[in-house]
């Protein structure tokens, strides 16, 4: 039994190093941005949606995460829908919302 203790002590620094590596890697992964933030959110935009169903609209400009302008509408029932920014109906909805926000 006395011979087993020195073998365990010999591996203690290696186990400590391994533990520190695992903890350091998991902290870095927890602080990293989510993969969904690094790509386009709107893969299949909708060309038409009745404006009465829209509660709010968020516009995301092109950037390193996505090369296209994205229009994300939150509907009154809580769902989200991507709108085609080139569609005439979507442009009218955005203009109305901009006019409404300037009035307040």
UniProtKB/Swiss-Prot annotation:
- S-S bonds: 40-66, 42-82
Location in the cell reads:
Secreted
Pfam families, per database record: IL8
> What InterPro entries does the entry give?
Chemokine_b/g/d, Chemokine_CXC, Chemokine_CXC_CS, Chemokine_IL8-like_dom, CXC_Chemokine_domain, Interleukin_8-like_sf
Q: Show the GO MF annotations.
A: chemokine activity; growth factor activity
| Keyword field contains Ligase | no
User: Could you tell me which SMART domains the record lists for this protein?
Assistant: SCY (SM00199)
The record's family statement is: Belongs to the intercrine alpha (chemokine CxC) family.
Q: Which PANTHER family match?
A: GROWTH-REGULATED ALPHA PROTEIN (PTHR12015:SF192), SMALL INDUCIBLE CYTOKINE A (PTHR12015)
Function summary: Has chemotactic activity for neutrophils.
Put simply, this protein is called Growth-regulated alpha protein
Q: From what organism does this protein derive?
A: Cavia porcellus (Guinea pig)
């Amino acid at each position: 039994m006395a011979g087993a203790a020195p073998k365990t002590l010999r591996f203690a620094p290696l186990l400590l190093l391994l533990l520190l590596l695992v903890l350091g890697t998991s902290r870095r992964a927890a602080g990293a941005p989510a993969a969904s933030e690094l790509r386009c959110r709107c893969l299949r935009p909708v060309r038409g949606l009745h404006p009465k169903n829209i509660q709010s609209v968020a516009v995301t400009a092109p950037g390193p995460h996505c090369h296209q302008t994205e229009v994300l509408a939150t509907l009154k029932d809580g769902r989200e829908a991507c709108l085609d920014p080139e569609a005439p109906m979507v442009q009218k909805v955005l203009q109305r919302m901009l006019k409404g926000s300037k009035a307040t």
